[in-house]
């Protein structure tokens, strides 16, 4: 078949999500860094499963590929986790962009050309929205798939054959990723995000192994022209202003003195898009009608534009501000003092922060994984503040936080982000936070303090590795400071000592060592380690159970 209808395409998406779920553990194992916290597979699994779960809950409102694109891409972004989840959401945003912007409300079928456009748009939007695109990742996969269509290398006549060629290119690219990123080649793995994206596409193709025929559900132009303006609408939180719809009889004029302009749909849509959003323009050239649907704060401008081309047969305007107001509770009165949303690996760290700093907006990540945009925004609600600082203990959370910052800006909430490399650095940053000062001053002070703080994490290497002339064998104890391996030793005690030596070079007058020990360390072992450190270095030491899964110790020196 050269087309696929809406219902079957949703099934293809479902199978793509399922294939990620079936392979996420292996994708995690492709993590480059020897720290065994590879979470690309988990992030992609959670991103897709949550977004698809939301899609299924709204399935009665999904009447077209445009509806599908709006719903699925919105939720992919909200539920995206980690770099892989956010980048995947941008690829899919591009994939659906043409469907959302140009498909009418009754388009329920995609053809070969639609898919070609979708894959080309996927590349364009993804590369545009990722500030520093890196080759050798899932971005490269979508770029080379897009190139096949641009160069007409993918000339498939059926959707099944088209996806077979897409997946062939995807896997060929995945295999080449070690040649594009030296760090992949050194570790003997392919890029985990690229692999995950290929798995998703392969899952979509598996649809054709289960069903032999497709249902032809495309509406004819005659059926399109019979659309009525009435109908159920699903209002989302982003739909404000006036929902304006009208049917225009082109060329008709009530006055012989007024000559109407010649209608050009592309130019008309361009003009409408300048004064409105959610624009849908459907024309029936045979009968000389055009139907317009758009959201605008100034419906009078939209009506005046239409009158340049003809006369109205039907007009309907709904105030979405009132509709949304009925669905929403009264707005919460927000405090102007800055508040913090902080991520930590475990409840042990969360308890410390609650007790010492009375902060309640805390996200624990060891069990739930990287925070999604949605979870960050939900945490903001707990603060009741209009000035927010995200304090994140992992650089991989930046993309999700950055998207949350963009959405908070639309909500007129001022926000910024302080990135640290581990939870002890976050604790250090909290010591200089002052709610009586503004966000800018606090962020500047916190970043400066963290920059001068000496800390490291210690774990066991999950694979052989080499970095900065440091040889790492599987099972070695390694220390990571400032996102780089600084120590590798066979024995844990020696690794701790060498790590402290490394950190002391950064601190002029060391007095205090703070340590959180993980689940693999008993209280007795931690106490013995504390005594050895105090005896060797003459430092005051505080050891606490952190209960973290990955790191045996997280150390900080002041």
Curated annotation (Swiss-Prot):
This is Uncharacterized protein MG369 homolog. One of its GO terms (biological process) is glycerol metabolic process. The lineage of its organism: Bacteria, Bacillati, Mycoplasmatota, Mycoplasmoidales, Mycoplasmoidaceae. InterPro entries: DegV_domain_contain, DhaL_dom, DhaL_dom_sf, FakA-like_C, FakA-like_M, YloV-like. PROSITE patterns: DHAL (PS51480). Pfam families: Dak2, FakA-like_C, FakA-like_M. Residues 7-206 form the DhaL domain. GO terms for molecular function: glycerone kinase activity. It comes from Mycoplasma pneumoniae (strain ATCC 29342 / M129 / Subtype 1) (Mycoplasmoides pneumoniae). It comes from the Bacteria.
